[in-house]
Amino acid sequence: DPYTSHGHDGILKSNKILNDKTIDILTQQSIIQAKAGCDVIAPSDMMDGRIGKIRKALDKNNFSNVRILSYAVKYASSFYGPFRDAVGSKNLLKGDKKTYQMDFSNRDEALREVALDIKEGADMVMVKPGLPYLDIIRDVKRNFKIPVLAYQVSGEYSLIMNSIKKGLVDDKIIYETLTSFKRAGANAIISYFSTSIAKNL
């Protein structure tokens, strides 16, 4: 979001995202990151076919051991609002990202996208946001023998923190929500609470 003048996740021309040209740049970025020492590449753009192109480029450049974490299930969600506000892209974005991010009312599409990304070379997959999509995390875990990660995004964090600050709930809700990800089948969780949780465990 913060690295473009328009707030979208790819190259924009005539109000349309150029899928293939965006993938070319993502592939170049992946090689640069691998050369810098990254063990895992995690493209979150949601362009069609990018996992296959990145995997081929990594292998061609002798980075076959670099893994790919695909944001295979990334929904066009209102839960990203606080992040966009924090990085200054909230007012940049014209329109929405529904043409390339997933429809939150669609369940089956998630499984199709995960299957495609695994076929293209993904080593693990992300479901983002996390809490509103516990059913999707469970579906992915049941249907694929691959690590699945949950992303507790900025909107989830803000809702929880604001509720704690106003005395509506106690901070045990943090552990409850994170446990729900594990119960649904997540192998790992990305959360803004990670540092505080690590200190208290």
Identify the meaning behind each predicted range:
Residues 1-201:
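Alpha/beta enzyme core
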